[in-house]
Amino acid sequence: MSIHSASPITRRKSRKIWVGNVPVGGDAPIAVQSMTNTETCDVAATVAQIRRLEDAGADIVRVSVPDMDAAEAFGKIKQQVNVPLVADIHFDYRIALRVAELGVDCLRINPGNIGREDRVKAVVDAARERNIPIRIGVNAGSLEKDLQKKYGEPTPEALLESAMRHVDHLDKLDFQNFKVSVKASDVFMAVAAYRLLARQIEQPLHLGITEAGGLRSGTVKSAVGLGMLLAEGIGDTIRISLAADPVEEIKVGFDILKSLHLRSRGINFIACPSCSRQNFDVVKTMNELEGRLEDLLVPMDVAVIGCVVNGPGEAKEAHVGLTGGTPNLVYIDGKPSQKLTNDNLVDELERLIRQKAAEKAEADASLIARG
């Protein structure tokens, strides 16, 4: 299959809901989201971080709202950003009611800790009145006490039962504008729980491996777990949970979707790990290009291969390809274009990539305009 091919994955059929102006589920692209890690009451810091996430491509951003002071701050934050905001609510249902008044785009609640059914109903009524979707967020670390007693420990079945308990509650209230997550820090538990849930409901699924770890370990866990589910067509929106800069969550999320041909944003680099055959410093070249070209949003493939063993083959499949040699050879759209020496290699390659990106953006826009 060509690297330019559409994804062979058939996605699970699900209802479409709207988080602000972002569709989730149905035939919508898989949305990538993150969560702020600033103090919500520090409005300036939170707004600054959300804007960085917007610049990185976040479709949706979640903000923790632990108390009423944070709820008031949330209202101020909402006025200063463009990306849809989800309010993360625990324990006090009145916080959900307040942020609903302040224009929240989605409410993330864990019905297990919101309290009595009348409180859940109050939240649902507020959401219905303003057409605000709800995310039922079930987590292995906060299962209801009766389920902990029944199962002895978190299991996929326990996560499913918790989720279905709350789905049934919303069904009884005739509320269908919701999505569901069943997260665990263990990859196999999370994957099994999502598979079970996908068979039970038609609502969109929010995927995540919770508390996955630091940048490296969390990326690996999330790529494995979410990759398994996404390859099966399961999942409508994703959040990569990392103990790192939230911007990294967006980058990793798009990289996972890129690798499965589910969604493209920016450059998809194909690069060799390098060996003694390399005719230029592949690692240094890649590091410099990735840093310099982060601002490019046009989906395109760039191959950086150090020698002629695999270089020509990979370069011919990319929009822009570099093959090491004496001198090095650049391919544009699969055809040899020009030779480059190692002098100013990165500068010249960056120039050619940006030139191709501009041409591709213009061609893509023209194609869309023609319908």
Swiss-Prot record:
InterPro entries: Dihydropteroate_synth-like_sf, IspG_bac, IspG_bac-typ, NO2/SO3_Rdtase_4Fe4S_sf
Alphabetic keyword roster: 4Fe-4S, Iron, Iron-sulfur, Isoprene biosynthesis, Metal-binding, Oxidoreductase
Enzyme Commission code: 1.17.7.3
Family matches, as Pfam families: GcpE
Signal sequence coordinates: none
Cofactor note (record): Binds 1 [4Fe-4S] cluster.
GO molecular function: 4 iron, 4 sulfur cluster binding; 4-hydroxy-3-methylbut-2-en-1-yl diphosphate synthase activity (ferredoxin); 4-hydroxy-3-methylbut-2-enyl-diphosphate synthase activity (flavodoxin); iron ion binding
Cofactor(s) required for function per UniProt: [4Fe-4S] cluster
Keyword Hydrolase: no
Descriptive protein name: 4-hydroxy-3-methylbut-2-en-1-yl diphosphate synthase (flavodoxin)
Native organism: Pseudomonas paraeruginosa (strain DSM 24068 / PA7) (Pseudomonas aeruginosa (strain PA7))
